[in-house]
Amino acid sequence: MINSMCGSSVSLKSENSRNKPQPTSPNESVLQSKKNATQSSADLEQTSLNLTPPSLNLPALKFDLDGDVEVQSPDSSMWESFFSDHLLDGDFMISSPVRNNVPSPQASTFNSNYNYAHQGIQSQSLSGCSPPRFSSPLGAFNSNKGKGLSPLHRVFNSPNNQYMQHVENLALPAIEEFLEEYQGDHGLGGGGGYSNSSNKVSSDIGSSSECFDMQNHIPSMLDSLTMQNSSRYCGSVSEDSSVHGGSSQLSQDSDFYHQMGSMASASLSQALQQERYQEKQQKQHQTQQQQQPQQQQQNLTVPIPIGMDQEQDSGLQLVHLLLACAEAVAKEEYMLARRYLHHLNRVVTPLGDSMQRVAACFTESLSARLAATLTTKPQSISNGTSMPRSSSSSCLSPFPSNSIEVLKIYQIVYQACPYVKFAHFTANQAIFEAFEAEERVHVIDLDILQGYQWPTFMQALAARPGGAPFLRITGVGPCIDSVRETGRCLTELAHSLRIPFEFHPVGEQLEDLKPHMFNRRVGEALAVNTVNRLHRVPGSHLGNLLSMIRDQAPNIVTLVEQEASHNGPYFLGRFLEALHYYSAIFDSLDATFPPESAQRAKVEQYIFAPEIRNIVACEGAERIERHERLEKWRKIMEGKGFRGVALSPNAVTQSRILLGLYSCDGYRLTEDKGCLLLGWQDRAIIAASAWRC
């Protein structure tokens, strides 16, 4: 999803302050401005521009040394493009661990009584190992000013959805027999995942107590959806000539939909009676071959809610169609899946509401999986059509993953949503506190990219009472040239801030790292930082990597990962979890950007759609988005000899301040055993934790 490429947006200038008192904390200007701020939301937004100390603001990427000597930053168009848009923007500095906590800003329009406990969403987990999310709401950010639940969330929270009510009995509707059939070599998931008990389906997975007949109701549901004449989000797999009987099947589909269309507006009982009558008539005029498409729809059990308004019902039916299509793909009922995709491609659009947009991404991903399955094995699916994957060398993105255009798209996410800022300054705060009073410090960044996380951290070290320590950063990345360029830029910044600095580049994949590459030195305090990166390390290499990190005896290890379970062994479970997770993200984008926003469309197309495609369409080594929940990471880290370190009250306070700077009230901050989770409404999105040996 969002990784360290998004980075910190900061101004890069220091100023000769010999005639000014030394700040006792790099966050002092933030704290003072917050003390004088009023409680209105307008004033809250005004303070967002005062978070960077005045001594660090400049209208250009220049570094002053002694007032009259000027050093121009290196000619790095990528850095200049990234930072130039944010020279006037504030950013979060790091609180000294000795400072007192500051209350969170609270706008007068906030309602602190907001509580989602009645929704019961915390019982949603396919793997059964999710922590009790959002059980300890923090501050004034549990407000009800945000959006209501999306159609997908209403599916999960509907009282009619019996299979969504209890975590120990969470069920995918009527698939237990299918899962049993795939216990052996025919499983559709897994492959390179982390080994633990969640890699097999729990026997607690059950089905709703009442069987729902898809044969009777899916056709009417299809016709009741609003047809759109806009261009399709992706090509329909039903038009693929590689599928046998394509033209004749389309004709049968048309007849089938026409025959069942009159049921759309009828009540449930009337629809059943009318269908039975039509079936009797069909038996007299149709052959057994024409009846097969109807017979293939048996045992697909997705409940259709009754009594909702038309808009909600349309969104819910769209969700049911996606689940039915995913189940057909999982059961290898390809002709039936083709028909669902044919209809989905007619009703979804990347320009509609959040439910339609996320459905468009999942529809395209299902099409890619089905198309590849019909021509080759899922393991060979590549991510190289209309949905680029920035992490794959085989993707056919309109521009390279490290181009200025992509960086600008990441910057849009960084500015519009708090997820990346939360990851960076929470990790930086933990590292800063672990380095207190240390004279020589060493940071190993396991995914340095452009190094955007570190300018604010370096500013904090420069403002430390007593002067900055000697700082060494080891940057790891797959491309040594890019890592070296990042080191050159950070070296220039450190020089402008008068920080003794050294950069050590390592051009390797994480699974290929060796202990000597860290260049560990005696007398240095060590921190290891990983933001949204460890989930991509193959399971067979993850244990060795963590053991090697532990042997380096770091003072602190900061781990930030997406709070989702996308590494289960079964395709249908991963699909449902991903649908829930990305629906929440698209909802947050919907509340952040204006309607018909071109920026939002770029974010969804080039950041989140490739992730969805990788989770849904790819298998084996090609499936790299293997997100795990915080509880799973706890087991992994503790199993390798690490113990958790509670994030400090300063981290909590600054997270509250961060959320107060965003106009949307849907963001939620919670604590879980010393860790912090940031989410949207009732769904956790990202989790931050700290560890020691």
From Swiss-Prot:
GO terms for cellular component: cytoplasm; nucleus. One of its GO terms (molecular function) is protein homodimerization activity. Disulfide bonds: none annotated. Keywords: Cytoplasm, Nucleus, Transcription, Transcription regulation. Residues 316-391 are annotated as: Leucine repeat I (LRI). The keyword Transcription applies. Residues 410-475 are annotated as: VHIID. Residues 485-516 are annotated as: Leucine repeat II (LRII). It is found in: Nucleus; Cytoplasm. GO terms for biological process: arbuscular mycorrhizal association; regulation of DNA-templated transcription; response to symbiotic fungus. Residues 1-43, 233-253, 268-298, 378-397 are annotated as: Disordered. PANTHER family: OSJNBA0084A10.13 PROTEIN-RELATED. Transcription factor acting as a central regulator of arbuscular mycorrhiza (AM)-related genes (e.g. PT4) required for the morphogenesis of arbuscules upon symbiosis with AM fungi (e.g. Rhizophagus irregularis). Also involved in restricting mycorrhizal colonization of the root meristem. This is GRAS family protein RAM1.
